[in-house]
Amino acid sequence: TSAGTHPKLSPVLVTSADQAAKLFGVGSMLHAMLAAVKKANGYVETWALAAEDNESGQKAAATVTLSGSTTKSGTLWLYVGGVSVSCKVVAGEELSAVATRLASAVNADATLPVTAQAAEKAVTLTCRWAGLTGNDLDLRLNVYGEDTPAGLVATCTAFTGGTANPDVTDAIAAFGDEQWHGIVMPWTDAANMTALESELDLRWGPMKQAESIAFTAFRGTLGETSTHGNARNSHLVTCMGTGRSPTPPYIWAAVNAVTAIASLETDPARPLQTLALPGVIPPALPDRWTMEERNVLLHDGIATFMVQSGDVVAIERQVTMYQTNVWNMPDPSYLDVNTPATLGYIRYATRARILQKFPRHKLASDGTRFGPGQAIVTPSVIRGELLALYRELEEAGIVENFDQYKADLIVERNKDD
């Protein structure tokens, strides 16, 4: 928001929710994402980059309309993006008074993603920022089974009207040459996703070798989520389908990212299933997808979650969005996010070993005669170093089949360079 003190499009290390509030403004999307990240895991190094609203963007809005006649005093519990707002209700009072009090309660919480305006018997909630992400804000009553005061009826509409996400192109340019192991992407429109996927491919490629994995989330029906998954095909992007969760998709993506990266950085080959996503609220029981429905989503490039005892949301299977090869044939090569994570880890370990052991060495052919102490390395020496590294990775459970690797490994000088 405009209250943020940090310049736009400038990456900054963030260590706490309070710091995020100061840097990016209380109630901003980035503040909410970072607060969720630090609550889920405060030890993962996290950087943030703020972007401006699209100048042509519109803000999403929703309405709570009151009707009936309250016959018993109580409390009205409204949830905006999974965050509760409580409002006192007095038996027999005018509904306009309840609406005014509800709007005041919403505006009293500056961390909410919305502001409120009362008019007669209705309260209009408006997202603090412009863009499509505002349409994904959930608005409902009684998430945890609270009771609405007898006689009072509160009807919530869906958030609509948000248009035009920020253009991620400038943010991508601000990435620089730094390697970001996990990137949280809140904007899932086709244009922004295409731009990000292109950048990820460049970083994955041989010239940069600074691979990253992007984490996104999508809110919608089973059909809408399936369609979104089938429209993408990147092995470096994973998208969690949230269903009708009260928690916004951008929070899902942030918590999913920090949880997954904390595990992948420790052991990229270890599956992520059953890892809890702290602070994420599951859909209501009737809205949860069945196993058969989740299986459909997995085949459409959408990662799935499970709900454990106590309504704890956890990763079920973290697949990438990659589904078909260049011939449009089904290809499971990069099915799980662990595959690109493991490949990236192996490449990084290999580069690090060679750069550490032979940082400024001259390259000579095997059998070359040179004096002691010369900073010279030969293909056979490098081959031996790679085999030793593979043994270490094998002991760490990252790779297997050492004998096959040894037989297949060829290290030779480039005749043309």
Regions found by a protein language model. Name each.
Residues T1-E45, T274-R288, E292-D417:
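Structured, hydrophobic secondary-structure cores that serve as assembly/anchoring elements
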Residues T1-T71, T75-S84, V89, A150-G176, ...:
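Structural signature of extracellular appendage/secretion-system components
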Residues S16-F24, S69-R140, I183, D201-L202:
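Extended, beta-strand-rich, solvent-exposed assembly scaffolds of outer structural proteins
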Residues M29, E52-K59, L102-T111, H228-G229:
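Short, solvent-exposed secondary-structure boundary motifs
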Residues Y43, T111-A122, M207-T216, I398-D408:
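Short glycine-rich, low-complexity/disordered patches
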Residues E45-D53, A103, A118, C127-L272:
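Extracellular Cys-Trp
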